[in-house]
Amino acid sequence: MAEAKIEEIGCEDRISVLPEDLLVVILDLLPTKDVVATMILSKRWLSIWTMVRTLEYTDDMDDESKKSVWWFLNKSLQLHKAPVIDSLCMELGPQCPTTDDVDIGKWVAKAVDCLVMTLTIKLLWSAGPTSLPKSLYSCTSLSELTLSDQILVNVPSSAYLPSLTELELICVVYKDEDSLVSFLSSCPVLEFLFVLRKIDDNVKTFTVKVPSLLELTYKNLCSDVVDNTDRCLVVNAPAVNTCQITDYSLESFSIEDMPCLQDATIDVDEAYHPDDKFLTSFSSVLSLRMHLSDAMVMRCTTINFSRLIKLSIYPYGPDMLETLLRLLGNAPKLKEFLVDYPSLIASQKFVYNPEDLPWSWKQPSHVPECLSSQLEIFEWRDYGDRIIEEEFLTYVLANSKRLKTATISLRLNLEDPELIIEEIKDLPRVSTTSHLLFK
């Protein structure tokens, strides 16, 4: 027992004699509450924690009965002495008090003064949206910023964020459209933008005009907007190479040419009727994922996707397999093709199931070029074994001369799935080297 105690003390001594800078680096890897707790270890440890450069304060969002982290946040930041803060995260839930002495702004200002590089502020408290210090919008060191929920984005005309490369705006409220425009225009090197909108965010025309932007993710999941008149998404970002647009609000779109675009995802309300200009903006992509309504797929058949290599489609409607082949005819370089019939999508609205498919279809007289000379990978998810599905699958397998793999995932609760698999295995395949896989 005595030897074990001596060994324990020796181990403690070896840690304690490390240089303070190294101890701070080690503490930066631990949760902030554990870091502060080290002050009780010894006199030397009493102040080491005050020099850490990574701070995270997060309320338990799943248990509102727990005491808010606010008091710990407020006290520990009062004692914090590091001249530089690399990262500060403050996520306050409904249990956070909303009295006048709860001042998030002063700690944001402190982080700015300490040349913060990564800042996350998420406010789910019961109070209304709160403004942040104007100094935040002129922080020269800030490279990553996340603003979420009860935050009022009120950007001064003097805003300038010369180092900001990543920005997330999640369910915030904007003072007005000018604040949004000023915010984005103040970020000359912004490369990544993630936007999740709420219904009442004070913006009708959401303008993204960022010449440096490389990746855009825009989500508007508000399908129950009462008045969507004049609501519009405007994108002018010529350097974007990855773009995801998810919008169930039926707002309109104005998308400028994106000549560098390589990867795109389009998921809009099934009632939305796109124009040619909207879809043409995505005609140069290499990889495309689309949640297709009948109107969407018909528009796509008139657009030439000359560079498209990978296509994933998620049909809303039941009667579009014939039209899909016309779309494939406009994608001569297509090598990967995925068809997925989801029964429930992110908007929480039910869509057509495979059992709703019509019984038969009319085969085209001309085989799409991509099937005869390019397609290598084909996947069908939620295959329902209806006649039209079997005919479509038969057509693809019989005409895809360079096919390497075809993967079929059967719809749940199908009767006799083993028999269906055997029937699919018996379908003729023009590519003798192709493999059939089942999930």
UniProtKB/Swiss-Prot annotation:
One Pfam entry for this protein is LRR_At5g56370
Ranges for domain FBD come to 360-410
Q: Which InterPro entries match?
A: F-box-like_dom_sf, F-box_dom, FBD, FBL13/AtMIF1-like, LRR_dom_sf, LRR_FXL15/At3g58940/PEG3-like
Top-level lineage group: Eukaryota
Q: Which SMART domains match?
A: FBD
Q: Where is the F-box domain?
A: 12-58
* PANTHER family, per database record: EMB|CAB62440.1-RELATED, F-BOX/RNI SUPERFAMILY PROTEIN-RELATED
**What is the protein name stated in its UniProt record?**
Putative FBD-associated F-box protein At1g05080
Q: Please report the organism this UniProt entry assigns to the protein.
A: Arabidopsis thaliana (Mouse-ear cress)
